[in-house]
Amino acid sequence: MECELIREGKIDQRGFTLVEVMVVLILMTLSFMVFLNALNTGKSVRARSELRTIQSVILSSLENQIRARRFDENLSAPWSSTLGKETSNGESSLTDFDDIDDFNGYSISSVSEHSAFSCDVTVNYVSPTSGFHSSQSGQTDYKSVMVKVSHPTLSAITDTMIISPGL
């Protein structure tokens, strides 16, 4: 009887074949892999963004500390001929710095609270005639302060400030 119904096409078959189930499983697996990859990419972008934010906050903080100092030891020209800490005056740490050029050569290999970050500062005399780009051998009324904040997995952020005595 069943054979006769099959020949006549009267049996109503419902359900999925094994091939259809396998195709659906493969397609679902591929779509989940793409979705998980997108989530992972978003997570790494967020982590990189957080590191960049910390890096820029450290840069801004150090620049504010530099701007808070006087232009030079001398209150008027002629300015100091040597740039850097005056160890003879007892300037050995950041809290002892009293003018901008004390930061020349200042370096932190590991920033407190963010040990993966490091900082370097370079101070030079510059002149407007050179477009503030090349350092001058003598004293001028302008100092170029370059602050660089580095991280092992990111490129360094560097900012250059041109500071004058404001006379």
Regions found by a protein language model. Name each.
Residues 50-167:
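Low-complexity, Gly/Pro-rich coil/beta segments used as flexible assembly/activation regions
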Residues 1-16, 167:
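N-terminal leader/signal peptides at the extreme start of proteins
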